[in-house]
Amino acid sequence: MESGFKASLKDAIRTIPDYPKPGVQFRDVTTLMGDAQAFRRSVDELVYPYAGNKVDKVAGIEARGFILGGAIAHQLSAGFVPIRKKGKLPRDTVRIAYSLEYGIDEMEMHRDAIEKGERIILVDDLIATGGTAEAAAKLLLQMGAEIVAACFIIDLPDLGGRKKLEALGVPVRTLVAFEGD
């Protein structure tokens, strides 16, 4: 049985069956973010292991990682680094290609967004297959960052994303898991 906190978080997350395709249970975290108490508690729970530790910046993955990452950066008095899809940033960038189910995509960040040795927390709303999070972590590591942790509200453990980050030596923190998805 799950704790009251985890059960309340799960209740705050809308499940949309058969979206974006049949057989998929889409976990919509925007309902949690729209609930002030649930959102604040989620941010607090993601932050508390790192409060008092040196965290230079929080890197958020487009798009919901921006919302969550900005709140976490604020609480940790850290800077914020957006990791975006190719072509969305206006200055000199570094990018990485990664595989999708049906092709290849790229993500990027500003070349001067982090300095070698900076301690970074990587953030997104959910980890599923881990392809996007793995690419973001590799990009940060290539830039010389030390990734303190990767934080997500939701883990879909059956899809194996967490293992990809752990294989890179990145600790993973999640708040709730939806198994069987």
Swiss-Prot record:
Recorded metabolic or biological pathway in which this protein acts: Purine metabolism; AMP biosynthesis via salvage pathway; AMP from adenine: step 1/1
Presence of the UniProt keyword Transferase in the record: yes
Cellular location(s): Cytoplasm
Record InterPro entries: Ade_phspho_trans, PRibTrfase_dom, PRTase-like, UPRTase/APRTase
A Pfam family hit: Pribosyltran
Reactions the enzyme catalyzes: AMP + diphosphate = 5-phospho-alpha-D-ribose 1-diphosphate + adenine
UniProt xrefs under CDD domains: PRTases_typeI (cd06223)
Keyword Ligase: no
PROSITE patterns membership: PUR_PYR_PR_TRANSFER
EC number annotated for this UniProt entry: 2.4.2.7
Biological processes, Gene Ontology terms: adenine salvage; AMP salvage; purine ribonucleoside salvage
GO cellular component, one term: cytoplasm
Molecular functions (GO terms): adenine binding; adenine phosphoribosyltransferase activity; AMP binding
Key words of the record: Cytoplasm, Glycosyltransferase, Purine salvage, Transferase
Protein purpose: Catalyzes a salvage reaction resulting in the formation of AMP, that is energically less costly than de novo synthesis.
Subunit structure: Homodimer.
Family: Belongs to the purine/pyrimidine phosphoribosyltransferase family.
Protein name: Adenine phosphoribosyltransferase
Provenance organism: Brucella anthropi (strain ATCC 49188 / DSM 6882 / CCUG 24695 / JCM 21032 / LMG 3331 / NBRC 15819 / NCTC 12168 / Alc 37) (Ochrobactrum anthropi)
